[in-house]
């Protein structure tokens, strides 16, 4: 989905700047998840003065996470509630029926057809409510409509898949391409976007050309000689959609619809008035609904009486902007934290909000016009969701070279019935899919941390097929492979599971080794100290109207670690922890530690070297030699 974007207008992100960090060492704190009174949450902490998006990408692929300018990573074998980094390859995403229902529910609300009110307006007069009998009748009719629509979308998806296969057999697409499954979506809206001819209207749409374009570009960049590189360079999403259109005509007629392409999207249209097509999602644009905006005094309940058959229309806009303080966002954040998480007023003041969700060490990278940076650039962003101008949700995200990383989401408690946490995640996944055609390295959606014993985090694994990061070898392991062992104990060397179950082929297909064998990799967790009050919930909290997993948190007993001296994060590929090449910052100058060793007193070396050894273990050799370790 395309987003309105002024993101590249603020911050002058010089690409020549480097990462500068301060080391806080090992930290112990109380845990916001299991609520243990002991200081059982164990992590390593860093503060970043500045941080390149490339270094942060490497850090989160080693298990780190940021909260404001603070970076943290759990000692997975020792901490009470081990958090595993979880991610999803966006082009492989298959929405569940529940996730599809969330999208449809919001569309019905935008059309004024959802029989629901915000919390602040409930409990007034029930005289205008639809009777139980009529509600059941309407529900049954809607269910029948949805079945018919889903059957049509399934048929159209199969037609597209056949067209893709035809293009592969004809040599237009590479034969070794990983083929994403075609997804066709219903187009919803009251103001239908008419095409040039007659009264044809968009009923369904597919963005399959975007992941195909990204897959072809990945093949061309990974193979030295390339495959049809001269031709492939012209395979933009627009070109691919035209090729698929031609192939679909060869496959056979699609009854009751005509097919046209627009800006890379394959649109299915009808000249007949369709009882299921009275709503609209406009591809390649902001979600826009509307015509009659609501003022704050009006009810959000849809009018269904005989005097007003025309449902009130609402307009949804999604707006991406660089991270900065916005008083309106802060007010929404306060309402969310106080009502949803029962925070104390002293915990939601402006200074803590800035520190948690506005301040970012990431050095902005502006769009350069090439295929290495998306149109919005890289850095930290706030994504606003507005209905008729009213701010209802804000997603805090980091856009990095390989992923969109979800940091936090807060929303208007009056709109809890819209399941905005799930809806925003779906929009962010779609954003990755559409932008990877322009930036092929941008493939993944990171959902932060996953704690198997925390029921509020179970929803993250519902975005399938998801992967968890192994805390020892730092390979990505399919969640379904890891789940049986996580059911038994909280700390697991995930890559061992795949090997022991003879699932190497599955692991090779779904996983990616993120570093060379001799390098050390690591795991992530939420901030251990300054923001412990935020650790009781997930990065992007489950909506309160959604049921948690049936399993209670009865597996909170922590797996025993072997000894205080054991440390799983030691580099398995190195015999010692060579700190000579760590890059040190001192009074504005930079040195390798080996250049400083002779001028430091024995007492100073005794204090500093254990810190450097621990630092090198948790960030790895490569980053320790690239990021500046500040000493004041």
Swiss-Prot record:
Keywords from the UniProt entry: Acyltransferase, Plant defense, Transferase, Ubl conjugation pathway
| Region Disordered, annotated ranges | 1-27, 113-144, 284-312, 517-580
Extract the InterPro entries matched here: Acyl_CoA_acyltransferase, Arg-tRNA-P_Trfase_1_euk, N-end_Aminoacyl_Trfase, N-end_Aminoacyl_Trfase_C, N-end_Aminoacyl_Trfase_N
Keyword Cytoplasm recorded:
no
According to the UniProt entry, its GO molecular function terms are: arginyl-tRNA--protein transferase activity
Q: Which of the seven top EC classes does this enzyme belong to?
A: transferase
UniProt biased composition (Polar residues)? 1-18, 285-296
Q: Where is the composition biased (Acidic residues)?
A: 538-563
Q: Which domain of life is it from?
A: Eukaryota
The biological process GO terms on file are: defense response to fungus; leaf senescence; regulation of lipid catabolic process; regulation of seed germination; response to abscisic acid
Q: Which reaction does it catalyse?
A: an N-terminal L-alpha-aminoacyl-[protein] + L-arginyl-tRNA(Arg) = an N-terminal L-arginyl-L-aminoacyl-[protein] + tRNA(Arg) + H(+)
Looking up Pfam families in the UniProt record yields:
ATE_C, ATE_N
Indicate, by first and last residue, each region the UniProt record lists as having compositional bias (Basic and acidic residues): 113-122, 298-310, 564-578
List the EC numbers from the record. Answer: 2.3.2.8
Is Transferase tagged as a keyword? Answer: yes
Q: What follows loss of this gene?
A: Delayed leaf senescence phenotype. The double mutants ate1 and ate2 show reduced seed germination potential and inhibition of seedling establishment by sucrose. The double mutants ate1 and ate2 exhibit abnormal shoot and leaf development.
> What family classification does the UniProt entry report for this protein?
Belongs to the R-transferase family.
What role is this protein assigned? Involved in the post-translational conjugation of arginine to the N-terminal aspartate or glutamate of a protein. This arginylation is required for degradation of the protein via the ubiquitin pathway. Component of the N-end rule pathway with ATE2 and PRT6. The N-end rule pathway regulates seed after-ripening, seedling sugar sensitivity, seedling lipid breakdown, and abscisic acid (ABA) sensitivity of germination. The end-rule pathway regulates various aspects of leaf and shoot development. Involved in the oxygen-dependent N-arginylation of RAP2-12, an activator of hypoxic gene expression.
The protein depicted here goes by the name Arginyl-tRNA--protein transferase 1
